[in-house]
Every structure is written in structure tokens, then in C-alpha cells.
């Protein structure tokens, strides 16, 4: 069985704002086990111990999603402070050089929380009036997706630097 893995910071508290749109417009749907999230590394290794060794250096932090932005084909919420996510992403990339983010498809990795992959006008109206959204990055999770199966949590890593 071939499986794909992702390391994400879940924001389950934002589900009431974005999950209806994500369910109708996104490839990785809530009903397939993918929570609202900011991706740290995809594809990712399944090396739980090595991931834990990287993430132990990072602590939880407050996150504000105050604006919407777009990539081609994707409407997303911008997390602030983005630099906190960027530092974790860079540490994971250094530790796992054989797993470039998004298989190296993008020159720059921009931390984001996907809201919709179509129906953009509806999504803007639905989400923009509820901004800013506040949450907390408290943990990262390693998710696994096997063929014809949903995403499932393999491991959880509390962000509590020691």
C-alpha cells in the first residue's frame, strides 16, 4: 500500500467558518479527514521520531487570520505571524531534504489555510465578514492518506519547546 503523508497545524476551531466551502470545493475535504490547517510539509516522511526531534524546538503561538488572498485556483486565509510557520517549515525542510514542499513545485512556500478551490465570490462573501479569525497553533499532526482511504492521524506533536 502506497501512502502519502502531510505534517499540518490543524485549526479545528475554524471548521464552522470554512468547512462547508472546503467540503464543496476542495480536493482534501473535511469528510475525508482533512481538518482546516496550515501545511508544514507535504509530502512528508512517516518518520515520527525525526519529526518530533524537529518540532520539539517550537512552542505554541497565537494566530490571527485577518485577510483572504489567492493563488491560481485557491482562495486562502493568511496566518499571522506567518514567520512562525515559515521557521517550522524551514526546519522540517532542512531535516528532510528528500521531501521538498509540494515536490518542489513552488519557488516560495507561503503559509496559508485553504478556504476554497472554486466558488470564490461566495467564499469571499461568506468568510470576509467574519474576519479577523483568532486561533492558536498548539500542535502539529502527521496525517496519512492511503489509496481510496481518508486522511488519518498517525501522530500528534504538541508545540511546547523545552
Predicted regions and their residues:
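Short, exposed beta-strand-loop hairpins at the edges of beta-sheets
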Residues: 144-147
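A short, structured active-site edge motif that brings together acidic residues
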Residues: 65-71
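Charge-rich, low-complexity N-terminal segments
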Residues: 73-78, 107
Amino acid at each position: 500500500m502506497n501512502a502519502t503523508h502531510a505534517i499540518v497545524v490543524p485549526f479545528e476551531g475554524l471548521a464552522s467558518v470554512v468547512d462547508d466551502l472546503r467540503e464543496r470545493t476542495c480536493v482534501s475535504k473535511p469528510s475525508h479527514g482533512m481538518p482546516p490547517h496550515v501545511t508544514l510539509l507535504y509530502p512528508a516522511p512517516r518518520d515520527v521520531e525525526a519529526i518530533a526531534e524537529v518540532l520539539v524546538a517550537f512552542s505554541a503561538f497565537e494566530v490571527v487570520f485577518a485577510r483572504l488572498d489567492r493563488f491560481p485556483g485557491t482562495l486562502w486565509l493568511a496566518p499571522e505571524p506567518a514567520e512562525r510557520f515559515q521557521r517550522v517549515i524551514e526546519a522540517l525542510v532542512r531535516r528532510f531534504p528528500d521531501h521538498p514542499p509540494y515536490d518542489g513545485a513552488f519557488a516560495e512556500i507561503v503559509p496559508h489555510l485553504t478556504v476554497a478551490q472554486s466558488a470564490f465570490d461566495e467564499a469571499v462573501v461568506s468568510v470576509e465578514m467574519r474576519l479577523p479569525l483568532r486561533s492558536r497553533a498548539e500542535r502539529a499532526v502527521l496525517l496519512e492518506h492511503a489509496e481510496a482511504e481518508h486522511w488519518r492521524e498517525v501522530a500528534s506533536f504538541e508545540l511546547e519547546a523545552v
